[in-house]
């Protein structure tokens, strides 16, 4: 019996494809652990991944990139650093609400 196998499409690749379809070209992150599957998906899609020294830096850089270029950007952090990214997310959200 001849079986053809198709490679499994992982969640990180699905996330990356969905965001790339929405125009995301840059991802700001503190690479490692939880984020790696998504980062692999973004790199496979040709998205530029910028590794940052801290989660808050990643958030502010994603916000600044979006303000300057008017293109969407992503801040991708793991659960252990989520609280560090909250100030940047709140600033981005507040600037849109003004």
Whereabouts are the PLM-identified features?
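N-terminal alpha/beta PP-like core and its mobile active-site loop of ThDP/TPP-dependent enzymes
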Residues: 1-98
């Amino acid at each position: 019996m001849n079986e053809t196998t198709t490679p499994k499409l992982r969640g990180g690749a699905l996330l990356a494809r969905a965001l790339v379809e929405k125009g995301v070209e840059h991802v700001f992150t503190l690479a490692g652990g939880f984020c790696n599957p998504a980062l692999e998906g973004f790199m496979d899609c040709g998205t530029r991944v910028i590794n940052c020294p801290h989660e808050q830096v990643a958030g502010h850089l994603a916000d600044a990139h979006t303000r300057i270029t008017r293109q969407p950007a992503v801040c991708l952090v793991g659960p252990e650093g989520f609280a560090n990214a909250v100030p940047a997310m709140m600033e981005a959200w507040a600037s849109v609400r003004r």
